[in-house]
């Protein structure tokens, strides 16, 4: 069983995203970021094919990032800041149109970054929801406020239709393998601030370097 097929554990995601942040939250360790994403892929995969339009792309992006981390310039990809500085100074990023660097680390991570925003919003909505909340509505709202802005109409339509098949809130909480509803809510409350910090810092770095709209 591969690392992305193992059972989802919310606690492992918490540990990974907490470990991401270094230097007083002024940088992100990419190995831990990738590990956190592996956990999120397991979360999506545990729901069958509903989130496959995101999880399949995430898996390919994870593999690209792992190849950089394990490659001859792996130290350059140790943190978000070092990756951005290295790729920009070495002209390894397609800034205005796709050309020779479609799989650059900066572009690859940007795609994961956008998807992280959707999952961040959705999981936070789950955390503050009540037993009668419709998960399909929560997920659609989170999607419309994030990933939908980067998808063509046909993908947006297919995504919102697939969300209708999402299970009840209690089923989501069982998938998280934490314990009771109260324990899941507490764990989400502990986890989401770290995910938010990682997202916000990445957004700030990409904004500073004008990388948020990479083709």
Swiss-Prot record:
Residues annotated as binding an N-acylsphingoid base 1-phosphate: 57, 61, 107, 111, 151
GO CC annotations on file: cytosol; endosome membrane; Golgi apparatus; nuclear outer membrane; plasma membrane
Record's bilayer topology term: Peripheral membrane protein
Record keywords: Cell membrane, Cytoplasm, Endosome, Golgi apparatus, Lipid transport, Lipid-binding, Membrane, Nucleus, Transport
Top-level taxon of origin: Eukaryota
Pfam families noted in UniProt: GLTP (PF08718)
Gene Ontology annotations of biological process type: ceramide 1-phosphate transport; ceramide transport; intermembrane lipid transfer; negative regulation of autophagy; negative regulation of interleukin-1 beta production; negative regulation of NLRP3 inflammasome complex assembly
Location within or outside the cell: Cytoplasm, Cytosol; Golgi apparatus, trans-Golgi network membrane; Cell membrane; Endosome membrane
Extent of the signal sequence: none
Coarse class of the protein's main subcellular location: cytoplasm
Reaction catalyzed: N-(hexadecanoyl)-sphing-4-enine-1-phosphate(in) = N-(hexadecanoyl)-sphing-4-enine-1-phosphate(out); N-(9Z-octadecenoyl)-sphing-4-enine-1-phosphate(in) = N-(9Z-octadecenoyl)-sphing-4-enine-1-phosphate(out)
GO molecular function: ceramide 1-phosphate binding; ceramide 1-phosphate transfer activity; phospholipid binding
Purpose: Mediates the intracellular transfer of ceramide-1-phosphate (C1P) between organelle membranes and the cell membrane. Required for normal structure of the Golgi stacks. Can bind phosphoceramides with a variety of aliphatic chains, but has a preference for lipids with saturated C16:0 or monounsaturated C18:1 aliphatic chains, and is inefficient with phosphoceramides containing lignoceryl (C24:0). Plays a role in the regulation of the cellular levels of ceramide-1-phosphate, and thereby contributes to the regulation of phospholipase PLA2G4A activity and the release of arachidonic acid.
UniProt similarity note: Belongs to the GLTP family.
Protein name in the entry: Ceramide-1-phosphate transfer protein
Origin organism lineage: Eukaryota, Metazoa, Chordata, Craniata, Vertebrata
């Amino acid at each position: 069983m591969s690392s992305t097929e193992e059972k989802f554990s919310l606690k492992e995601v918490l540990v990974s995203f907490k470990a991401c942040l270094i230097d007083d939250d002024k940088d992100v360790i990419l190995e831990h970021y990738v590990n956190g994403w592996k956990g999120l892929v397991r979360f999506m995969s545990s729901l069958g094919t509903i989130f496959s339009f995101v999880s399949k792309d995430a898996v390919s992006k994870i593999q690209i990032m792992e190849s950089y981390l394990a490659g001859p310039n792996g130290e350059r990809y140790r943190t978000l800041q070092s990756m951005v500085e290295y790729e920009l100074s070495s002209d390894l990023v397609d800034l205005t149109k796709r050309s020779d660097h479609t799989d650059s680390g900066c572009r690859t991570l940007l795609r994961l970054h956008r998807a992280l925003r959707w999952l961040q919003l959705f999981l936070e909505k789950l955390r503050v929801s009540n037993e009668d909340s419709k998960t399909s509505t929560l997920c659609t709202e989170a999607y419309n406020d994030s990933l939908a802005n980067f998808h063509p109409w046909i993908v947006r339509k297919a995504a919102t239709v697939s969300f209708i098949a999402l299970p009840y809130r209690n089923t989501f909480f069982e998938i998280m393998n934490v314990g009771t509803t109260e324990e899941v809510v507490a764990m989400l409350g502990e986890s989401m601030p770290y995910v938010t910090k990682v997202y916000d810092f990445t957004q700030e770095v990409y904004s500073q370097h004008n990388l948020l709209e990479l083709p």
